[in-house]
Amino acid sequence: MRRRRGIVGIEAAIVLIAFVIVAAALAFVALNMGLFTTQKSKEVMQRGLEEATSALEVDGSVIARAIDADTTTGSYNIVVDALAVPLKISPGREGIDLDPSKLTVRLLLPNGFYENVYCGYASGSAGEDFEAVLSNAPTGCEPYTTSPGPFVATDAYVYVINGDGDSVLELGEKGLLIIRLDSDTTATIDVDYLEPYDKIMIELRAVSGASLTLERVIPPTLPPLDSTSDATTGTTTYAVAPVDLG
């Protein structure tokens, strides 16, 4: 009769322990790979969400400035030559760099298109009137020598209210995107001011995130204004008034 050798208890235990250790190691590797993949997926989704949403959002009504560009007494040419767009950082975003190399402002006007009119940023405080904000343009923008008065070039800048002095608009800080449109009718080049029913499209694009685009239409009626010019003294007085564009 042939003898057959069986497995004793201790040998079976060793084999089972080996199986358990190998299975545990494989389970740990699989779990670790799963957690790593999940984390990477979250990061990709977060980056995609950041690229799909703008870091800026409009924080209130857009205010425009109406001016009578005709300085002849009793004669009127009331147009819009400046806009202020209130901005803030979108929820979940840390901030946006306002340096001209990292932000662009595109304009689509009835008379044409500007690829980038952004010229910088400036800091101010709450309580300043519109004319003060328009006068405090940063270095690199066209100087505004006569306030109130027309602008000799079309440009844009961000006016930071109650900021900390750096170039980053952060959560809790307020910014005004100032658009100044060429309204100098004495120059030989075409002007860019807006008349009733005209539409303006503004696009802000930062180095990351989606662009912020907004459109506004000038209302059919503007405030009654009358700029004057004294031929004897050569003094010109421009009449201006704010307009709420919503």
From Swiss-Prot:
Pfam families: Arch_flagellin. One of its GO terms (cellular component) is archaeal-type flagellum. Residues 1-6 form a propeptide. Keywords: Archaeal flagellum. Coiled coil: none annotated. The keyword DNA damage does not apply. It is found in: Archaeal flagellum. GO terms for molecular function: structural molecule activity. The keyword 4Fe-4S does not apply. GO terms for biological process: archaeal or bacterial-type flagellum-dependent cell motility. Belongs to the archaeal flagellin family. Flagellin is the subunit protein which polymerizes to form the filaments of archaeal flagella. PANTHER family: FLAGELLIN B1. This is Probable flagellin 2. The lineage of its organism: Archaea, Thermoproteota, Thermoprotei, Desulfurococcales, Desulfurococcaceae.
